[in-house]
Structures are given as C-alpha cells and as structure tokens.
C-alpha cells in the first residue's frame, strides 16, 4: 500500500495554501508594487526636474548673451579709468544680474581694474562658472565672468523633493553642488546602490547637469517592514498549524476510518458491515464501500476467467500471425525460384519481409483499411507464385472506406480461408467488397470455389463460438473471438455457402470503436 499523508495534514496544508499564504503574498505584491510605483514616480519627477532646470539655465544663458550683444556698443564708449563710467558699468551689470532667475555674481577684470558684485567676498571657486565674455571698452578689453551660486528652481527641488543637483565637466570634475556630501573640484563617482539620478548636457563644453535622490531611508523602511511581516507570518503559521491540526483531527476521524476500510477492501479482508461512529453523509460512502466490495468480489472472478481467455486468444494470435505452414511453403517456393528465376525469388523475399513486418508490428493494434488490403494483395501474390496465377483477387471499395481504421489482421483470415478451403484444380476468383453504412464497415468476401455442404456449413458456423482450443478452424474462430473482444456484440460474422457454388462471408465492423487498441 502506498504511504499517503493523512488527510488532516493535507487539510492543514490546504488552510495555509488557501488563506495565510495568499494574504501574505498579496501583501508582498502590494509592497513590491508600491515600491515599483514609487521608483517610477521618482524617476518621472527627476526627469521632469532635469528638463525644467536645463530649460531655466538655457533661458538665463540666452538672456545674458542677448544683453551683452545689445550693450556691446555702449560698453565700447565707456572708459573704465573714468569714475563715472565705472559707476555706469556697475549699474548695467547689476541690472543684468538682477533680471536673471538665479543667484549670480560677476567679475570684470582688466588692466589695473577689477569690478565685482561679490561684496561678501564669497569664494567663487565653489561656484559654477556660468559664462565668460570679452567686453571691449574705450580704454581696453576686459574679461567678464559670471558665476552661479544657486537658482530658485534647484532650491525648490532640494527643499520640496529632497533631490540634489550637480554640474560636472567632461572629465566628471564637480563644478557645482548643492549637497554637502560633494565637494567642488573633486571627481564625481556615481553611487551604485541607493541613488536614483538622471543627467543632461548643458552646453558645448560637455558640462552636464545631474539631479539625484538618496533613497536609502526608503529602502531601510522597506526592509524593516519586511522583517515585521516575516515575524507576523511566523506567528500566523504557528497559530494556523495548531488550530488546523486540532480541527482536522475532529473532522477527519471518520475519513480515516473509511480510508482504513478501503485498505481492507483492497486487500479483500473487509469483513462484515460496521457503521461509522458519527451519523453524517459519510455513512453513504461507508455503505457504498461494502456494496462495491461485494460487487468487486464477483467481478474479480469473472475478470480472472476473461483474462485467461484473452491470454489464450493472444497465444493463438501469435501462432496464426506467424503462419508456419504459409512460411514453410513460401520458403520452399523461394528455394525453387532461386535457380529458375532469381529476380522473381528476390521479389518474393521482399513481399514476404513486408508481410512479416506488418504482422509482427506491435506498436498499434489498429491500421488503416488500405494497409490491410495491401497486405492481402501481397499474400495473394505469393500464393499465385505457388499456384501458377490461379487466384484472381478483385477489390471493390470507395476511397473513403480505404481510409477507415480497423483492427489489424481483421480481413486477411477471410482470404486465407477462401484459398485454403475453396480452391481446387481450377482457378479461384475472390471478390472483396467494402461499403460504409451507419457508422459500420460492411465487408463481403465472395469466392467461386468448391463451397460447403449444408452439414459442413452448419459445423463451421457452430465452431465460431467454440473455445480457441476446441476447434481446428483457427482462422475464422480466432477472427470471430477477436472481433467480439474488440468491438463487442455489434460485430457480426455470417457465412453462406453451397456445394460447388462458392462461399460468401458477410462481416460487419463498427467504426465507432475501431480506433481503440485492445
């Protein structure tokens, strides 16, 4: 007996599979989905902020360039050695700086002159060099450098979304940072874990704006939540195990009793009827087990008898398929032909090998009718070599009938019987007519042989129902028994014959069960 797990164990496992684990799985999926959506939203936000910041910086740069272009002629008329012209220059540059949406500082340097709005003396080395311009004045050419300390947009992003900004050059040197974790002038090394970032090119000098966010705190919160969920799951498993085991023991006591009775019934030791302790619908199963046990005992004896008969029929099938007399006669014919007609002998050997391959094929007990007819034609061809072409075979069949499936060797015994018992010294004509009607294949095998007398015909008809060991007419008897096993009582085999007028065999094969191997 196979060692199965008790039903209460399966019930307990089913409780986990159907309640606890799905709930936990939903929570896990929800948590993962939340984090996936969170990451997606953050990426979208960073992308949006990068675009907005890039647009803002480009706009500021464009305004500065436009201002410089428009006032270029005015600057050429000013002389920075003149106090009034210096004041005018400062006023114009401050006007430029104050119009921009950013905190900017300028430095105008030239021969013996330095002008700036960096009154607090901030270190411009920690600022981003926004742009550089050459301005021609009346007395000389000066260099204008504009530094960016911050922009309102980057400050808002840092304050509202905790997203920080960097500006790096083409060698990843940090030119600007609003995060204390980075120092201007150092190399920028992207963090491999816990950071989301996106960058965009700012100008032709390959300066890049990088906006990033630190999500370490979010990841740590997620890990903490997972630990809490794991602890809750362990508690649920322990509680569910104890509860399910107690409930399963109460609910499955009668089921275990029934399983024990099934085991006894399987080993044919059930004994007399005993009711279950609890009056429930399981009593119906208990009654059915005893009724089924009694029915099985009756069927077992019948099946054992049927199996013995099937084995006997299979043995006879093997004996008939090998056809020792036919093989012996054919081998003698081949021996005779080797000296007279080697080519014809080779043809006979090929036909015989094809017949043996067909009859000994064991992968399926069903074949197409067309294969069976080819086998019959080869069989008759070999017999004609022995009997000097005295056997004429005619097959009348539609193309549809030829593609129907029947049991293997279901027609050949009819032809074998016609040749063996119908032939005399004259030629023998055998006609096979195949028709389809109402899901049945009707086979008519007619010959013009010597036929049978009434008494002989009666004897042959009775032999069809005899045991395979109790008759010498193995071919028809075996065919009839095989058809009854494979097709049931729907198969019919009728024999009609008159002395010196030939024999007619009518054979009906149901097609609805023809595809089932036996």
UniProtKB/Swiss-Prot annotation:
How this chain sits in the membrane, per its record, is: Multi-pass membrane protein
**So what does this one do?**
Member of the two-component regulatory system HptS/HptR that regulates genes involved in hexose phosphate transport system in response to changes in extracellular phosphate sources. May act as a sensor protein kinase which is autophosphorylated at a histidine residue and transfers its phosphate group to the conserved aspartic acid residue in the regulatory domain of HptS. In turn, HptS antagonizes CcpA-dependent transcription of a subset of CcpA-regulated genes involved in antibiotic susceptibility.
Q: Which residues carry this modification: Phosphohistidine?
A: 325
Q: What happens when the gene is disrupted?
A: Deletion leads to impaired growth when the available carbon source is limited to glucose-6-phosphate. Deletion also alters antibiotic susceptibility.
Which residues span the membrane? Answer: 20-40, 222-242
* Sorted UniProt keywords: ATP-binding, Cell membrane, Kinase, Membrane, Nucleotide-binding, Phosphoprotein, Transferase, Transmembrane, Transmembrane helix, Two-component regulatory system
Write down the species.
Staphylococcus aureus (strain NCTC 8325 / PS 47)
List, in alphabetical order, the GO biological process terms annotated in this UniProt record: signal transduction
- Catalytic activity annotated for this protein? ATP + protein L-histidine = ADP + protein N-phospho-L-histidine
A Gene Ontology cellular component where this protein is annotated is: plasma membrane
The record's listing under InterPro entries reads:
Bact_2-comp_sensor_kinase (IPR050640), HATPase_C_sf (IPR036890), Sig_transdc_His_kin_internal (IPR010559)
Q: Which gene encodes it?
A: hptS
* Compartment annotation: Cell membrane
Could you identify this protein by its name?
Answer: Sensor protein kinase HptS
Entry PTM: Autophosphorylated.
Among SUPFAM superfamilies, the record links this protein to:
ATPase domain of HSP90 chaperone/DNA topoisomerase II/histidine kinase
**Enzyme Commission numbers on file:** 2.7.13.3
